[in-house]
């Protein structure tokens, strides 16, 4: 078996399948590597085994070597333990960002280099360019599928060793290529949601690791209107799963989460989807990461996303002495959530990002700074 110059992460999905096909067409020695990032937990969810079989089948059709690596221990320590700690603290983490940084572009890269490869490739919708002496992370051509948001923690060494073969394709074109090439995954549906939860109920899954503690649901005036099964099951702006029935004297309208008092185990809700309690124009981050190794300036303007697929929002960024950033948006933002990722862009280029630590949303600021006072919030 010849030494591969490129090792592709094959997931068993159509995206990595077409990425493998494109590389195979170039005639360079390549190999596929399937990563198992989650150990069987006895739940009966065998999606990983199905994905592995599909990955083997694709490699067989293309005539490229198949490799398997079990990274479940690395995933648990580098991603899942952090995921649980964040939820226990009342924040809403983004495990896909951490998985890319800690597993796919760290342990996978190491495994590929151990096989003798010079570069790795993945089926992400993103692009890499070398400009001005630095490697740049660019959005994928299909803006609806662009995954640069999840890749913003990558650095120069990783980008220098990475290919994104499908970054210049639209999803519809990719599907046609897969069918025309006879790839067995051409009609396979896209995976969604958090990878280790799969099709399982999120609340039931999280409850296995974080003991549930029921508490009060209150309105902005502090009146108890219902009970929740645990504050960490909910995120700001959420509507689904509250199970609030008819409340006497209130309209028959949906309720939305507007605040989480983790210390006192209280969830706050409002019937206004765009409640002022959810609005913020300022946020403070944890330490920021810059794709090129440094920010464009100490203060600069750009656009930002505070959740995946959110429209770009103009903002001003101030880099702090400790490496964190403060961001002020031109217009109020709804449900900016601590624990989620702030990702910054200059046009098509992803500059980097950081974890959101705090915002100036009225209720969240109150709860972060002191015990809740209904007189202040109302």
From Swiss-Prot:
It is found in: Cytoplasm. Its EC number is 2.8.1.13. It is an enzyme of class 2 (transferase). The keyword Calcium does not apply. InterPro entries: MnmA-like (IPR004506), MnmA-like_C (IPR046885), MnmA-like_central (IPR046884), MnmA-like_central_sf (IPR023382), Rossmann-like_a/b/a_fold (IPR014729). Keywords: ATP-binding, Cytoplasm, Disulfide bond, Nucleotide-binding, RNA-binding, Transferase, tRNA processing, tRNA-binding. Residues 145-147, 307-308 are annotated as: Interaction with tRNA. One of its GO terms (molecular function) is tRNA-uridine 2-sulfurtransferase activity. The record marks 124, 340 as: Interaction with tRNA. Residues 94-96 are annotated as: Interaction with target base in tRNA. The active site is at residues 99, 195. PANTHER family: MITOCHONDRIAL TRNA-SPECIFIC 2-THIOURIDYLASE 1, TRNA 5-METHYLAMINOMETHYL-2-THIOURIDYLATE -METHYLTRANSFERASE. Catalyzes the 2-thiolation of uridine at the wobble position (U34) of tRNA, leading to the formation of s(2)U34. This is tRNA-specific 2-thiouridylase MnmA. It comes from Xanthomonas euvesicatoria pv. vesicatoria (strain 85-10).
